[in-house]
């Protein structure tokens, strides 16, 4: 979404920190073991991150605990899940998000699915790889909704403040 009007001054409002959603709200209590990183992949990610730290590069995996917030999910998440890894209590190695968790992270909750007639949430009709790609390429619906509301609000105020010459007069 993009809107521009040269004589309207707009800045995004600061986020309401009381509404921050942590990972624990989307995590499954007993995810299938196939989402746990193998010893080989976990060692590879650690070694790769160390190599890049020594070179001064920014590569690293995102190791999250359930009380934190997730990093951005990308379409490449299906490859190794390194952007968003979840610390484990019972297992030594971290795990990736399940497709169901990724769906909820990106805002496609069961309540959202009901708006489209899916009473039990959106069914997964593609492979895990395709699901991760689709979620990683999507935009969070709530983000789009909030941006659109801000644009409508500012434009409505600008129209209300229109001066007699027909030009939009901003009082910002």
What does each model-identified segment do?
Residues 40-172:
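C-terminal target-recognition/interaction regions appended to catalytic cores
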Residues 1-48, 70, 90:
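Flexible, glycine-/basic-rich loop-and-beta segments that form/coincide
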């Amino acid at each position: 979404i993009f809107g521009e009007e040269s004589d309207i001054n707009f800045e995004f409002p600061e986020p309401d920190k009381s509404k921050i959603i942590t990972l624990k709200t989307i995590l499954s209590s007993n995810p299938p073991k196939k989402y746990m990183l193998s010893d080989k992949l976990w060692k590879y990610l650690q070694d790769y991150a160390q190599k890049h730290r020594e070179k001064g590069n920014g590569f690293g995996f995102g190791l999250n605990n359930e009380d934190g917030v997730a990093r951005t999910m990308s379409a490449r998440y299906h490859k190794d899940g390194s952007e968003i890894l979840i610390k484990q209590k019972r297992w030594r190695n971290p795990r990736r998000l399940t497709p169901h968790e990724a769906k909820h992270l990106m805002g496609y909750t069961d309540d959202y699915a009901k708006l489209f007639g899916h009473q039990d949430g959106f069914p997964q009709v593609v492979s895990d790889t395709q699901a991760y790609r689709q979620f990683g390429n999507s935009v969070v619906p709530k983000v789009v909704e909030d941006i659109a509301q801000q644009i409508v609000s500012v434009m409505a105020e600008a129209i209300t403040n229109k001066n007699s010459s027909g030009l939009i007069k901003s009082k910002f």
